[in-house]
């Protein structure tokens, strides 16, 4: 475990990430917390090792995490257990005054350990609902929303969902999405990107697809059907389809 020097001059905040979308969405929030709080960044490693995520930290100019849990297990239950166990060890060491999490992946379940330790939980992207318990994230988001101290929603619809479920209005704040700040901050870098040239593409003349959900890619038959559909789309519109291959899909 890392050696950490703890001071008392600023509020001590822990932010936990575990997936690449979380890293992207929180990139500017992390920068602000680094400036104004005593901030510790934790990566669960729930899906892949740090090296597979390192490109995102480098591209987004985010510092390396202070802690890396390496929580990936042989199945979802083992991973969730590891996430909670390792988070509790880190919370015991750091004694944070607040926890920030975003979204509904298994990394958000560190909130269970935080709740046990009475650490205030701030949950960004709260209140999203699909009303389908076959979706693992639907279970996660219901748990996390209901144990968080402050739920930060992207929309009025998400806020209404939480109110209907009985959460107090004074614990729900509509903030909007952090992607506005992310896109504004990186717009020059995006504009100067050479990716289209590298892939021999013309702007607005291609389809971009990313598929990683287990219900789409874990079944060879369903994945084959998806690929066949993409081929039909490409042939119909005479445009290439670029598939951003998620490690889960590649495997």
Can you name each region flagged by the protein language model?
Residues 222-238:
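Short hydrophobic signal-anchor/transmembrane segments that target glycosyltransferases
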Residues 46-51, 70, 147-222:
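A nucleotide-sugar donor-handling region in carbohydrate enzymes
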Residues 47-63:
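N-terminal beta-loop-helix "entrance" segment that forms/cooperates
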Residues 13-23, 212-224:
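Short, glycine-rich nucleotide/cofactor-binding loops
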Residues 239-251:
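Catalytic donor nucleotide-activated moiety binding site of glycosyltransferases and closely related
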Residues 15, 41-43, 101, 123, ...:
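Structural beta-sheet core signal
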Residues 14-17, 22-29, 56, 68-168:
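Active-site and donor-binding regions of nucleotide-sugar-utilizing enzymes
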Residues 1-46:
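N-terminal subdomain of nucleotide-sugar transferases
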